[in-house]
Amino acid sequence: TRWAFTDYTQFSPEHQGFSPLPEKRQVLGVATSGELLGLGVWAEYAWNSMERTEDFYGLVVGSNYTFDFQTYVMLEYYRNTLGKTDSDEYTLNDWMRFIASEQKALSRDQVYFLAQHPLTDFIEAGISSIYSISDNSVVIAPTLEYSFAQNMQITAYLNFNIGEEGSVYSDMQGNGGLIRARVYF
């Protein structure tokens, strides 16, 4: 397949924007999922063989469980060797590629946690967090979801960034929130 990063440090009049860096990529992946001791478990691995840039891989290992009292928890580890091992290594290109969704994560190693619990038949509260092992930063996002009809819901969430300046979840980025309405059809 064709893969293209963008060089955000070079402007290209020919492309009327930043310089694209296209190359061929071959991906070999494997995934598995199942149950182990009552826990849902899964793993995914993808090796990316690149034409010019350094090869990299992504690995996800996770587990989930729903307690008898209806609380759902999930824990997932994500490793992406395209990411960096320390926030001092992040470049402008890394940040821009992350923002433009050209790469999935800035940091090499992350842990994701999610917990959800139904408060009523129509309201569910939750909290999720992503911890960057690579730069020791974290984002925490409490959520509240209201399903007022079979195919309609309103979700509100906040996010709190906690980390040193320059880290992927630096508190210098500020905190925020969002209210989203969804209709399924």
Predicted regions and their residues:
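Transmembrane beta-strands of outer-membrane beta-barrel pores
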Residues: 1-7, 36-38, 47-51, 77-83, ...
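Residues that define the transmembrane beta-barrel architecture of outer-membrane proteins
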Residues: 24-28, 55-59, 107-111, 136-140, ...
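Structural signature of outer-membrane beta-barrel channels/translocons
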Residues: 33-37, 64-68, 116-118, 145-147, ...
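Extracellular loop and loop/strand-boundary signature of outer-membrane beta-barrel proteins
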Residues: 14-18, 47-49, 97-101, 128-130, ...
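Outer-membrane beta-barrel "beta-signal"
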Residues: 113-117, 146, 153, 157-158, ...
